[in-house]
Amino acid sequence: MTDFSRADGRAVDQMRTVKITRGFTSNPAGSVLVEFGNTRVMCTASVELGVPRFKRDSGEGWLTAEYAMLPAATAERNARESMRGKVKGRTHEISRLIGRSLRAAVDLDELGENTINIDCDVLQADGGTRTASITGAYVALADAIAVLKEQGVVPGNPLKAAVAAVSVGVIDGQVCLDLPYEEDSRADVDMNVIMQGDRFVEIQGTGEHNTFDRDELAVILDFAQKGCQELFAAQKAALEQ
């Protein structure tokens, strides 16, 4: 669709400005502020000696993740889920997605019987909070593992290739990369794609308001691959600073 335009002026295959700031807080072994445009997420990686009961005496480590949004992360304040006494299904789903995605980046055998806890707290939400969380948390994870290696805690080299994630949607028949909230809320098709190198870790896709065919899916995945390659470069640049 040649007359299609995005509210922020980006090309349809263009990412928002991505910033990754390491050492955002001082207590965790790894700490990052990741920004996808106006979406900002604090990602931390904390190390715990030992593993959950189901992993004991296995020789393997474990990685788990928690995701949450601060009350004022959105235009209208939302009460903390802990105060309501119940965590939403969406929060559980995203927490599990982050954990699955980052376990793809770690060799649990090489981690030894140690646990890495990933916490992703959304400071400001403008679409793509789960994809920003995964992308930023990988950098925090890399820093945490570097600390473990320096301390001689881990027996091997647990970190594998980088993992990054991006959203892609179809809006008015046009595939668009990295959706802010304004686009995400009206997308006909909405996908989150997690990649490691040129391989897919997970693909979440829904025809929110319309169906899609194989040709559209191919374009969506091409856009996602382009975005993830740019995110890999941003992660690498951040870790080299």
UniProtKB/Swiss-Prot annotation:
Gene3D superfamilies on file: GHMP Kinase, N-terminal domain
InterPro entries associated with the record: ExoRNase_PH_dom1 (IPR001247), ExoRNase_PH_dom2 (IPR015847), ExoRNase_PH_dom2_sf (IPR036345), PNPase/RNase_PH_dom_sf (IPR027408), Ribosomal_Su5_D2-typ_SF (IPR020568), RNase_PH (IPR050080), RNase_PH_bac-type (IPR002381), RNase_PH_CS (IPR018336)
Membership in a protein family: Belongs to the RNase PH family.
Binding positions (phosphate): R90, G128, T129, R130
Protein name according to UniProt: Ribonuclease PH
The keyword S-adenosyl-L-methionine is assigned to this record: no
Main function: Phosphorolytic 3'-5' exoribonuclease that plays an important role in tRNA 3'-end maturation. Removes nucleotide residues following the 3'-CCA terminus of tRNAs; can also add nucleotides to the ends of RNA molecules by using nucleoside diphosphates as substrates, but this may not be physiologically important. Probably plays a role in initiation of 16S rRNA degradation (leading to ribosome degradation) during starvation.
